[in-house]
Amino acid sequence: LQATAYICLVIATLCWGGNSVAGKLAVGHISPMMLTFLRWFLAVAFIAIISVPQLKKDWPVARKNLPLLLCYGAIGYTLFNAMLYSAVQYTTAINVAIEQAGIPMLIFLLNFFFFRTGISLAQCLGFGMTLMGVALTAAHGDLATLLQLQLNRGDGLMLIAIAAYSLYTIFLRWKPPVDWRTLMAFPALAAMLTSLPLLLWEIGRGAAQWPDQAGWSITFYTAIFPSLLAQILYIKGVEAIGANRAGLFINLVPVFGTLLSVVLIGERLQSFHMVALMLTLGGIAIAEKGRPKASAPTVPASPVD
């Protein structure tokens, strides 16, 4: 049973790690906002197939919490992915993959400032290391560029994406008591609706690009694998080995994203990438190890939906 759970969690994080690579491969084949809209349009169709009976059961509870569920989709699904797919137009998929490791750090900071969650010395050290790794990546190995406020446009957009997903995760503490299919379906529908104005804006600028054959392949990948399959496998993994242990597998997302960027795109893995990976993953590991037991999460949020 544990082996099956591990396989499910590895495949889930592999799918999520491939999202930034898919965004990079989409350049020249489909525009960012078009990809965001079509991804969630297709995802809604796929999710509806497995969710409609459950949605009817959960509707009384979901209706009372509709604004919150729609907020999940607008921030965690639309804004995150729109910024990510825009970011890879200007920076490497490796950078985008590594920078996502900053999400746990920002979640920690938001929890501390708004909810005064416990903090340990190990957590301070760990998240300091993670911050250094993300900063090193965003600065392309030259921290002096940050001091001069010369941040690459793509890395800047990715920082917005990280902030959006961190806020989404914080809001999950108020998630309604509904089935996981309902918790996927309504935010996905909200993502489809809120990504439409972004698509219209892109069309108005004359920057929209309808997908070609490769673009459609990428769109179907993002709609099926990161949006649906990864979510299902992650939930199965959590059910089998518990949320805390399953949450550790999320740290594989930047690793898989980096490896896939090298193998599939042929991006060059530079020395600062290696240092940044060691800093971010090492920092997360130290922070997790030093987490006060009382503040351990019961349900870690699935990343990079």
Where are the regions that the model predicts?
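Hydrophobic/small/kink-forming positions within alpha-helical transmembrane segments
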Residues: 17, 21, 73-78, 82, ...
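Glycine-/small-residue-enriched transmembrane alpha-helix faces in small-molecule transporters
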Residues: 1-34, 145-174, 193, 260, ...
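Hydrophobic transmembrane alpha-helices of multi-pass small-molecule transport proteins
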Residues: 47, 119-141, 195, 251, ...
